[in-house]
């Protein structure tokens, strides 16, 4: 069989050539030069297909105009028909912007914890924080159930012992199952239903039952259903303290919330619950509910002698008093961070929610044209983005979010980043146009084949594999696939053009398909395999990305394989002569060559002297296959200690009319020649030694790369949405809602004349330590005016007088405004709000001896008056140390010169009486501004609701646990995600599946025995860390009556007033589920792999205990879960998936390279190069501070596939150089290796360098993406490309010059041997795995399970 008929063994050049006609001698091919038209006319088009041979038939088909046109038509129409079918009959593809796409949601640990979290959140809507005190309804229900059980026991019915129940539980949540309406709302990807949201409060407004609120939400009245929301988080910044509770920051927050309510269209979408009808000041806003915010406490309004806590006031109330009132409600802690407590009234952030109601005006109900209502709201709410983005100040950073705003921001960011892909695509398209000799025909079909392949890949991805969303990581495909596809296009074009020695069009086409098809198949196989390795990842985003990219690469190769040969056939017959004539015509009209025209000799080397056959192309621009013309005469190479023949290299010299680009490529090739001459010949051992040293160091550093310690960054760290996502991950700011937690619902309007709460109200407010009582006066009673006068004597400094009396005794004179003088200022005589700094006005007569001087002098000090120096107390007043609302800044100082008097002024220059630093007698303070007349200060300015006897006891908040809290759960089976259609940044985990056979009173004995067993295991549980049943009220005395096993249950070590983490779920009068909490000995700071052993110990011990229960008991379906387990498995499985992907990609590449090279000494340099490249790239990632996350996991497997290309191109060039080995070197293997290495670099060096530069330039737009995975992926690809080309030109050449076989040529026999060796190695590997499994060894899988 001839080599031209063998698709695997076909080398680049065919042996048979027909004698060329003199008229066409030296012409490279049709369309390549102006004279190409004459050769084209000599071709005879076959009128009928050849009778024998597959390749002959294929060559005829692609050179026949009708068949080639049909192939192009089918190649264009089939993808369009498939895509039209997909778009018309299948749901539209959307971008998967779910944050959970980076979590391993299908893992057992994640599903267990999500089920418990959702069961808890269905009542309160919160997980991850210390849950607050619930309503009395909870404990009353459980106490009723226990009473019924005890009555049955007394009546002789002992079959159902009852359980202890809590009266309140901040982390104890009594959950109700989500209603059908709630499930419907989740399917709509919206906020939870009102019935579920109504339970998101732990105490209702006084005087009404919290359960009465349900009537508000089920009403069909317009906008009474709180259905949408905007989340706001205000972060304090600008100083070291970062306390949000300062007057400046609170005023800023209040102004922002007012701007939101004043936004056009707000009243048509706002939430209008029935309760706000009682708030008279809200009438100007059409009774829209104000933001759910603490501003309702800080900015109350006064109307008709009553205080309304609605946040509509203009003046800031007393900050401390407002906080004391708000803290009496457990809901208060929803608004602040974890650090706030009774002793530390500081928070770094403040949360707020703006609620919007449904149904909208002109709609009968929420379900009435729901999609239309939703579209209207989405169009309205996105108008807030531009406004909110400008509200941050130097003191307050404003973060805005919510379901619709999150989705809008993600999609807008994604679309903006995708615009950068057009830059890469445009550059590549221009490059295609230039490299095809400005051929519009070839450029069009080259780009079209790539685009059409993307449509087919989308069809397979969406229809065949049934994936509904495109992952956000799939956007990288827009940058990568054009470069990959264009490489294949270039291969076919350049292969066809370089086959000028073949006169027969069919032979030329057969040669092109065989050579280019084989080369592109190999590179596409390794690339697709590298991406497909990520399909086994348990991270959904990584899995979808790997599948999508492997489909695109495969479809692109198939599209190019069929489209480009047909396009080349038609181009050579019809378009090439037309393009040449058009170019010649343009040149003649312009009188000179266009600067954008690249003549055909740019792609083919000039003729050699003597009119010999044309050489192959000098500027080798293909970056996938080496096209080595064995007819080229070898260049003259100086090999130092190797004696080689000298040959001519005229072919390397450009023709006189070659443009500057051709000269540049020739110079680059000459530079590479000298470089490799040094690397592969003179210093090859030095390079190998350096390579070995770097490899060892790289292995050491690469092994230190740690798994990701946090969820992956989706966006730049400083962007609004990423900061919000960080808060969600670290502060549990996930889809939590507290719609009735503000003062509007928690406080009834109070009379200004009666701020004292009744004893019953104070009893309901909390169970902690009472506030310290303070005696304070009102703002009107405590304010006074300090008047300043002076005496000015000639030759003596002015002496100032401070007085609370406006009269002016002689010789004092009034102070005139100007020059820093202060005639008077307002002060508080008692502490008021933030005016708590005490200053004293001291008077003295010492040192005033002159007759003209006044008899007294004054000064201001922060300390007591110094009687030893003659200073006596006159009066004192209170000021603020920081700027407040309606305040001004004043300075004071004491002179260090006689008579040592003091002075106050409005600017520092007037008070520079000494150069000493600020101290008790020098500094500044803030006083109420005189610009606001006393009459204009409202009744709410500085209003303290806790005056006199205080507001009652603050609600208790448990401390943060130091160890991992493990929950043992019964009554919950898992999660139902079958109907989940969630595509939000922060998604809904699904719905809880409860165990209907679970009966708490039937199993109470087994539960008590199990809790004792777990609590007694000191290796798992900390002493005093067992919380068997929810506690909080004094019902423990009933436990011993429920079952004998429940006697002497271990009690948790709780702080005074702190309640346990255990929880009980109640529905329809029965206990539905229960969770016992245990503080584990696991330390959260341990590594994931160390923590994994703790998980296994917990799992093993619980399984052992459950096996002791009777068969058929519902407790056998119990499980243990922990939030920490979920996090560590994300890291462990992410790393395992990356390693498996790396190994799988490496095995595929090794097998492909082995079959392709057919020699172990050619395979070894490639493998060593790949190992060095990957290790060095991972080491640089470690030095850069990166961790092994989702993006890095993707990159690791891709590195192998992309690193192998350049090395294999070099080896292919080495093999092809052996086809024309000089006879003088036949006896010297060392000289043969070095000569073949240099010949390979001479022919492929410019190509692979050009390919590397093109790849790096194509990834540059990725650096500027806001989506963090895009930017990091671009950096990794650029880094890997740079390291790959460096190692290829140094390490690979040196290794080939040392160990490659000197006279080896690829044959059919060597191919079969290599294929057999690969199959044998695979069989041995499979056999070894089976032996290990038989011997009891467990093989870990990417999913975290074991075989």
Swiss-Prot record:
Q: Where is the SSD domain?
A: 412-570
Domain of life here? Eukaryota
Its predominant location is: endoplasmic reticulum
Stretches with biased composition (Low complexity): 159-168
Q: Which residues lie on this side of the membrane: Lumenal?
A: 89-417, 461-463, 550, 706-1137, 1181-1246, 1303-1310
Q: Which residues lie on this side of the membrane: Cytoplasmic?
A: 1-67, 439, 485-528, 572-684, 1159, 1268-1281, 1332-1347
Q: Where in the cell is it found?
A: Endoplasmic reticulum membrane; Nucleus membrane; Cytoplasmic vesicle membrane
Under the heading InterPro entries, the entry gives: DISP3, DUF7023, HMGCR/SNAP/NPC1-like_SSD, SSD
User: What membrane topology term does the record carry?
Assistant: Multi-pass membrane protein
Q: Among the entry's GO cellular component annotations, what is one?
A: nuclear membrane
Cite a single GO BP annotation.
cell differentiation
Concerning its family, UniProt says: Belongs to the patched family.
Instruction: Please state what the annotation says regarding this protein's domains.
Output: The SSD (sterol-sensing) domain is necessary for the increase in cellular cholesterol uptake.
Q: What does this protein do?
A: Plays a role in neuronal proliferation and differentiation. Plays a role in the accumulation of cellular cholesterol. Involved in intracellular lipid droplet formation. May contribute to cholesterol homeostasis in neuronal cells.
Listed PANTHER family: PROTEIN DISPATCHED HOMOLOG 3
Protein's name according to its UniProt entry: Protein dispatched homolog 3
Which organism encodes this protein?
Answer: Mus musculus
Q: Which gene encodes it?
A: Disp3
């Amino acid at each position: 069989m001839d080599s031209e008929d063998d698709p695997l063994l076909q080398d680049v050049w065919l042996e048979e050539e027909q004698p060329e006609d003199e008229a066409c001698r030296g012409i490279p091919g049709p369309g390549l030069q102006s004279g190409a038209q004459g050769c084209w006319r000599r071709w005879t088009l076959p009128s009928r297909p050849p009778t024998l041979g597959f390749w002959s038939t294929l060559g005829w088909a692609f050179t026949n105009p009708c068949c080639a046109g049909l192939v192009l038509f089918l190649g264009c129409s089939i993808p369009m028909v498939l895509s039209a079918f997909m778009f018309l009959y299948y749901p539209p593809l959307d971008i998967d912007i779910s944050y959970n796409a980076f979590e391993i949601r299908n893992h057992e640990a994640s599903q267990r914890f999500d089920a418990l979290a959702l069961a808890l959140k269905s009542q309160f809507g919160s997980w991850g924080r210390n849950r607050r005190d619930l309503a009395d309804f909870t404990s009353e229900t459980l106490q009723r159930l226990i009473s019924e059980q005890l009555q049955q026991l007394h009546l002789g019915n002992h079959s159902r012992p009852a359980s202890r129940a809590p009266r309140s539980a901040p982390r104890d949540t009594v959950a109700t199952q989500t209603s059908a309406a709630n499930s419907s709302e989740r399917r709509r990807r919206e906020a939870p239903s009102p019935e579920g949201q109504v339970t998101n409060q732990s105490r209702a407004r006084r005087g009404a039952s919290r359960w009465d609120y349900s009537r508000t939400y089920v009403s069909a009245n317009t906008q009474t259903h709180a259905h949408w929301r905007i989340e706001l988080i205000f972060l304090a910044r600008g100083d070291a303290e970062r306390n949000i509770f300062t007057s400046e920051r609170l005023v800023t927050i209040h102004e922002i919330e007012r701007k939101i309510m004043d936004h056009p269209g707000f009243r048509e979408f706002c939430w209008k619950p029935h309760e706000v009808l009682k708030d008279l000041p809200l009438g100007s806003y059409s009774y829209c509910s104000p933001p759910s915010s603490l501003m309702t406490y800080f900015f109350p309004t006064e109307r008709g002698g009553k205080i309304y806590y609605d946040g509509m006031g203009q003046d800031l109330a007393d900050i401390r008093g407002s906080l004391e009132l708000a803290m009496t409600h457990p809901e208060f802690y929803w608004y602040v961070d974890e650090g706030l407590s009774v002793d530390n009234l500081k928070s770094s952030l403040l949360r707020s929610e703006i609620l919007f109601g449904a149904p909208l005006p002109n709609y009968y109900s929420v379900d009435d044209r729901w999609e239309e209502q939703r579209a209207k709201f989405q169009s309205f709410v996105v108008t807030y983005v531009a406004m909110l983005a400008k509200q941050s100040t130097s003191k307050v950073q404003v973060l805005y979010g919510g379901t619709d705003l999150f989705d809008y921001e993600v999609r807008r960011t994604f679309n903006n980043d995708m615009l950068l892909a057009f830059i890469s695509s445009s550059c590549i398209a221009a490059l295609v146009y230039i490299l095809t000799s400005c051929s519009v025909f070839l450029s069009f079909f080259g780009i079209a084949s790539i685009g059409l392949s993307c449509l087919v890949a989308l069809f397979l991805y969406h229809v065949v594999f049934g994936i509904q969303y495109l992952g956000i990581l799939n956007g990288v495909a827009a940058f990568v696939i054009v470069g990959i596809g264009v490489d294949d296009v270039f291969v076919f074009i350049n292969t066809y053009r370089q086959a000028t020695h073949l006169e027969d069009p069919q032979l030329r086409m057969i040669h092109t398909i065989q050579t280019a098809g084989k080369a592109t198949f190999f590179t596409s196989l390794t690339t697709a395999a590298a991406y497909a390795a990520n399909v086994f990842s348990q991270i959904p985003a990584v899995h979808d990305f790997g599948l999508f990219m492997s489909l695109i690469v495969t479809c692109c190769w198939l599209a190019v394989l069929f489209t480009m040969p047909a396009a080349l056939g038609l181009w050579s017959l019809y378009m090439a002569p037309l393009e040449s004539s058009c170019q010649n015509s343009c040149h003649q009209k312009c009188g000179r060559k266009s600067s954008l025209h690249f003549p055909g000799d740019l792609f083919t080397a000039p003729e050699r002297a003597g009119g010999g056959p044309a050489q192959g192309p000098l500027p080798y621009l293909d970056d996938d296959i080496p096209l080595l013309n064995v007819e080229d005469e070898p260049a003259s190479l100086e090999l130092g200690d190797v004696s080689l023949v000298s040959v001519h290299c005229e072919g390397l010299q450009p023709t006189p009319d070659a443009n500057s680009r051709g000269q540049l490529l020739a110079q680059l090739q000459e530079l590479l020649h000298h470089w490799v001459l040094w690397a592969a010949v003179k210093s090859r051992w030095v390079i190998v030694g350096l390579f070995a040293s770097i490899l060892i160091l790289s292995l050491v550093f690469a092994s230190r790369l740690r798994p990701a310690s946090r969820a992956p960054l989706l966006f730049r760290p400083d962007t609004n949405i990423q900061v919000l996502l960080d808060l969600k991950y670290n502060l549990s700011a996930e889809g939590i809602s507290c719609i009735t937690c503000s003062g509007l619902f928690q406080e009834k309007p109070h009379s200004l004349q009666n701020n004292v709460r009744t004893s019953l109200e104070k009893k309901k407010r909390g169970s902690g330590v009472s506030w310290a009582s303070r005696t304070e006066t009102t703002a009107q009673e405590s304010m006074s005016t300090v008047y300043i006068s002076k005496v000015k004597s000639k030759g003596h400094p002015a002496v100032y007088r401070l007085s609370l009396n406006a009269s002016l005794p002689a010789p004092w004179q009034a102070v005139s405004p100007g020059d820093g003088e202060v005639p008077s200022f307002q002060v508080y005589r008692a502490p008021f709000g933030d005016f708590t700094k005490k200053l004293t006005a001291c008077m003295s007569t010492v040192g005033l001896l002159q007759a003209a001087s006044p008899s007294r002098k004054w000064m201001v000090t922060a300390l007591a008056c110094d009687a030893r120096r003659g200073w006596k107390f006159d009066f004192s007043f209170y000021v603020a140390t920081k700027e407040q609302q309606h305040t001004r800044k004043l300075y004071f100082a004491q002179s260090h010169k006689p008579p040592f008097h003091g002075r106050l002024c409005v600017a520092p220059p007037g008070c520079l009486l000494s150069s000493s630093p600020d101290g008790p007698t020098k500094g500044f303070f803030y006083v109420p501004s005189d610009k606001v007349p006393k009459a204009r200060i409202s009744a709410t300015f500085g209003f303290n609701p806790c005056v006199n006897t205080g507001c009652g006891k603050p609600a208790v908040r448990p401390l943060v646990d130091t160890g991992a809290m493990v929950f043992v759960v019964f009554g919950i089976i898992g999660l139902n995600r079958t109907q989940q259609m969630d595509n939000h940044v922060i998604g809904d985990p699904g719905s809880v599946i409860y165990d209907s056979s679970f009966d708490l009173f039937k199993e109470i004995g087994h539960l008590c025995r199990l809790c004792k067993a777990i609590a007694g295991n000191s290796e798992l549980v900390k002493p005093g860390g067992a919380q068997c049943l929810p506690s909080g009220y004094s019902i423990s005395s009933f436990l011993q009556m429920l079952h004998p096993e429940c006697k002497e249950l271990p009690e948790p070590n709780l702080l005074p007033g702190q309640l346990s983490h255990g929880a009980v779920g109640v529905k329809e009068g029965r206990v539905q589920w229960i969770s016992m909490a245990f503080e584990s000995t696991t330390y959260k700071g341990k590594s994931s792999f160390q923590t994994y052993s703790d998980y296994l110990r917990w799992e093993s011990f619980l399984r052992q205990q459950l096996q002791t229960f009777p068969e058929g008991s519902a407790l056998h379906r119990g499980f243990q879960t922990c939030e920490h387990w979920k996090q560590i498995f994300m890291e462990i499985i992410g790393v395992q998936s990356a390693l498996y992907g790396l190994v799988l990609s490496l095995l595929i590449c090794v097998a492909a390279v082995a079959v392709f090279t057919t020699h172990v000494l050619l395979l070894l340099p490639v493998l060593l190069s790949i190992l060095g490249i990957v290790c060095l790239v991972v080491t640089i990632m470690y030095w850069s501070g990166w961790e092994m996350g989702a993006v890095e996991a993707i990159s690791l497997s891709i590195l192998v596939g992309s690193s192998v290309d350049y090395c294999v191109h070099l080896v292919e060039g080495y093999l092809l150089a052996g086809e024309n080995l000089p006879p003088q070197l036949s006896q010297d293997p060392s000289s043969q290796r070095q000569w073949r290495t240099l010949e390979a670099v001479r022919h492929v060096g410019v190509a692979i360098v050009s390919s590397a530069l093109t790849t790096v330039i194509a990834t540059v737009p990725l650096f500027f993406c806001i989506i963090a995975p895009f930017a990091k992926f671009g950096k990794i690809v650029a880094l890997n490309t740079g390291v790959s080309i460096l190692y290829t030109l140094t390490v690979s050449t040196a290794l080939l010059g040392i160990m490659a076989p000197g006279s080896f040529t690829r044959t059919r026999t060597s191919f079969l041997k290599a294929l057999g060796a690969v199959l044998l190695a695979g069989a041995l590997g499979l056999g070894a795995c089976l032996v290990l499994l038989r011997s009891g060894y467990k093989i870990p899988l990417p999913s975290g399970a074991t075989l």
